[in-house]
UniProtKB/Swiss-Prot annotation:
The protein's name in its UniProt record: Erythropoietin
Expression (tissue specificity): Produced by kidney or liver of adult mammals and by liver of fetal or neonatal mammals.
Organism of origin: Homo sapiens
Effect seen on changing residue 70 to N: In ECYT5; uncertain significance
Location, primary (coarse class): secreted
Gene of this entry: EPO
């Protein structure tokens, strides 16, 4: 059986096995993110990370304010946006969220007694964000974000701050459930991606 004869389910399985490692999914179908099970896996990980920090006070403080994307969505305005504008907002939000989680990871590593369950979920979030970035790049989100039709009218990314890992993971979870899911749904529906 040649590479080109490989069934689609095998590509999906191989791709999903590569995702937790944060490795680029080379040779995978470019629309893998369009499979709802893929995004649901990341949503589940984000929700687990948020849940692990419930009631956690001592180990869950970031000891500084970290800037994260505001995850509120005005659905009326979102539906009226061009896909390119949506891509800009998602791409900028994903980049800022990745920076925030990496900063949280650095703070946790430098703490005197990092809490292992928290460290595990932070590491998973870093890996997940890298994989999502790769999947969005394969979908063409980066290309759309660089050259939307009316880039001059793009509003600056709204931000908030997180001072605990719970809030950081809540933003992560909400971003995936909100803007990322809305964007990928629209981008996957259109046939020219």
């Amino acid at each position: 059986m040649g590479v080109h004869e490989c069934p689609a389910w095998l590509w999906l399985l191989l791709s999903l096995l590569s995702l937790p490692l944060g490795l680029p999914v080379l040779g995978a179908p470019p629309r893998l993110i369009c499979d709802s099970r893929v995004l649901e896996r990341y949503l589940l990980e984000a929700k687990e990370a948020e849940n692990i920090t419930t009631g956690c006070a001592e180990h869950c403080s970031l000891n500084e304010n970290i800037t994260v994307p505001d995850t509120k969505v005005n659905f009326y305005a979102w539906k009226r946006m061009e896909v390119g504008q949506q891509a800009v907002e998602v791409w900028q939000g994903l980049a800022l969220l990745s920076e925030a989680v990496l900063r949280g990871q650095a703070l946790l590593v430098n703490s005197s007694q990092p809490w292992e369950p928290l460290q595990l979920h932070v590491d998973k979030a870093v890996s997940g964000l890298r994989s999502l970035t790769t999947l969005l790049r394969a979908l063409g989100a980066q290309k759309e974000a660089i050259s939307p039709p009316d880039a001059a009218s793009a509003a600056p990314l709204r931000t908030i701050t997180a001072d605990t890992f719970r809030k950081l993971f809540r933003v992560y979870s909400n971003f995936l459930r909100g803007k990322l899911k809305l964007y990928t749904g629209e981008a996957c529906r259109t046939g020219d991606r």
